[in-house]
């Protein structure tokens, strides 16, 4: 029976899952929209929602807690300075998941996870190695 099994394993070890979701949180905060598989998006959503709630509460201890969860200080700064102000009046529901068809190759269900009221200019901003080489 599946009683009490809340999260998906996603065929990964616990350390791999934790690192993957930390990276996905940082990417979502950076670009405000990412494309991933539907099960990963569904698992990522509550993690990001809790991080935004930490950002709204503010404070040094909560900032350190967010850093330990995400490992990317620049995105934690954006979380506490930009996103916390944007969602100050919203009581949860900071993200949405939109189904995006199926991936060619393995037919995996894909989804777009994005912030509600997101900044359209953040998408693809400072993305990948090409940007670093050009700078």
Swiss-Prot record:
Gene3D superfamilies referenced in this protein's UniProt entry, alphabetically: Ribosomal protein L17
Disulphides: none
One of the record's GO cellular component terms: cytosolic large ribosomal subunit
Keywords of the record: Ribonucleoprotein, Ribosomal protein
Presence of keyword Glycoprotein: no
Domain of life, per lineage: Bacteria
One GO MF term attached to the UniProt entry: structural constituent of ribosome
Residue stretches spanning the membrane: none
Keyword Ribosomal protein: yes
A Pfam family of this chain: Ribosomal_L17
GO annotation terms (biological process): translation
Protein family (similarity comment): Belongs to the bacterial ribosomal protein bL17 family.
Subunit description: Part of the 50S ribosomal subunit. Contacts protein L32.
Protein's name according to its UniProt entry: Large ribosomal subunit protein bL17
Lineage of the organism: Bacteria, Pseudomonadati, Pseudomonadota, Alphaproteobacteria, Hyphomicrobiales
Gene it is expressed from: rplQ
């Amino acid at each position: 029976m599946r009683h009490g099994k809340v999260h998906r394993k996603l065929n990964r070890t616990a350390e791999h899952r934790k690192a993957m979701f930390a990276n996905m949180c940082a990417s979502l905060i950076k670009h405000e929209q990412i494309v991933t598989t539907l099960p990963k998006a569904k698992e990522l959503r509550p993690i990001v929602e809790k991080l935004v709630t930490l950002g709204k509460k503010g404070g040094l201890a909560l900032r350190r807690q967010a850093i330990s969860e995400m490992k990317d200080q620049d995105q934690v700064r954006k979380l506490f300075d930009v996103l916390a102000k944007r969602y100050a009046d919203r009581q949860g529901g900071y993200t949405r998941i939109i189904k995006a068809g199926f991936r060619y190759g393995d037919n995996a269900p894909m989804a777009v996870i994005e912030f509600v009221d997101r900044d359209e200019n953040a998408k693809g901003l400072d993305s990948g190695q090409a940007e670093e080489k050009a700078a």
